[in-house]
């Protein structure tokens, strides 16, 4: 009942770096770090964790869509350390898309083309807009329904789709960067000023 008081008295301030230090210090065999954030600061810890034999499972798209050099470094570290770097939930809402692609490539197939709806948010918004429901209201509805990122500008700017495209292309064997993705934005930038 008095957890807040106890936390204030006995708790300690934390940050991602401190968390990483504590995990490494524990040195538990077969440790797995699960990142359910969207934080670049947390994603920046993966290399340190992996170099200390901690597997990483990430819903966070930051690492897998970061620079190609960082992405390949993380994949190589996982391979070299015989640990896991998994990010299946980065695309397809957890459907086994990345695993299936890896199975195809490992069996000698080459992925030449992917077709996908890469944004549930944009799909929801475009299916909701009508004469009665303006764009701005559809955005709010998507957010309330749990489709949109906490900051819908990430969806509307195309950033989330670009990250997913980069991750899928890399897993298909193509060394792409986010800057390589051609952008056809569906909104003028000034539309986003009123959000989140």
Placement of each model-derived feature along the sequence:
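A generic secondary-structure micro-motif detector
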Residues: 34-36, 64, 128, 155
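N-terminal glycine-/serine-/threonine-rich beta1-alpha1-beta2 phosphate-ribose binding loop
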Residues: 1-51
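Substrate-binding/catalytic subdomain of NAD(P)-dependent oxidoreductase enzymes
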Residues: 128-129, 137-196
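Generic structural signal for well-ordered, non-membrane alpha-helical segments
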Residues: 16, 30, 71, 94, ...
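Rossmann-fold NAD(P)-binding glycine/threonine-rich loop
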Residues: 39-52, 61-89, 93-104
